[in-house]
Amino acid sequence: MVSRDFDRDKRLLTARQFSAVFDSPTGKVPGKHVLLLARENGLDHPRLGLVIGKKNVKLAVQRNRLKRLIRESFRHNQETLAGWDIVVIARKGLGELENPELHQQFGKLWKRLLRNRPRTESPADAPGVADGTHA
């Protein structure tokens, strides 16, 4: 069974990691008052970054509640999100949503992100494998 923790290795920590997702996202999912940007990370686990600014969510209490709920939703869905770096960007109005509505919305957003995942090549389709020219 995969660990459902939210350790340091499951977070985007540096500006370089955030920039990689912002500069070339392979997945983009808009939602009600939120935008998800994602990029494949080549790891066996997903990583999450949150952008919840004062301009869009005024009260610190609301920002902290949103961070808690988003992290919790991510934690429960991380098995299906393996291999992604995901940045959640809050927009105006996200702080006014109630907890059940937020849980429901993020459940749908994670599923939409998975549907938008680019198809990976099968080993037989990869260059150099079928023709035996790989090193």
From Swiss-Prot:
GO molecular function terms noted in the UniProt entry: 3'-tRNA processing endoribonuclease activity; ribonuclease P activity; tRNA binding
UniProt cross-references to PROSITE patterns, sorted A to Z: RIBONUCLEASE_P
EC number(s) from the headed UniProt entry: 3.1.26.5
Q: Which InterPro entries match?
A: Ribosomal_Su5_D2-typ_SF, Ribsml_uS5_D2-typ_fold_subgr, RNase_P, RNase_P_CS
Enzyme class label: hydrolase
Catalytic activity annotation: Endonucleolytic cleavage of RNA, removing 5'-extranucleotides from tRNA precursor
Q: Which Gene3D superfamilies does the entry mention?
A: 3.30.230.10
Q: Which Pfam families match?
A: Ribonuclease_P (PF00825)
Which keywords label this protein? Endonuclease, Hydrolase, Nuclease, RNA-binding, tRNA processing
Cellular component, GO annotation:
ribonuclease P complex
- Swiss-Prot/TrEMBL GO biological process terms: tRNA 3'-end processing; tRNA 5'-leader removal
For whether the record's keyword set contains Transcription regulation, the answer is: no
Say if the entry is tagged with keyword RNA-binding. yes
> What does the function comment of this entry state?
RNaseP catalyzes the removal of the 5'-leader sequence from pre-tRNA to produce the mature 5'-terminus. It can also cleave other RNA substrates such as 4.5S RNA. The protein component plays an auxiliary but essential role in vivo by binding to the 5'-leader sequence and broadening the substrate specificity of the ribozyme.
UniProt-listed NCBIfam families: rnpA
Complexes and interactors = Consists of a catalytic RNA component (M1 or rnpB) and a protein subunit.
Report the family membership.
Belongs to the RnpA family.
The name on file for this protein is: Ribonuclease P protein component
The organism of origin for this protein: Pseudomonas aeruginosa (strain ATCC 15692 / DSM 22644 / CIP 104116 / JCM 14847 / LMG 12228 / 1C / PRS 101 / PAO1)
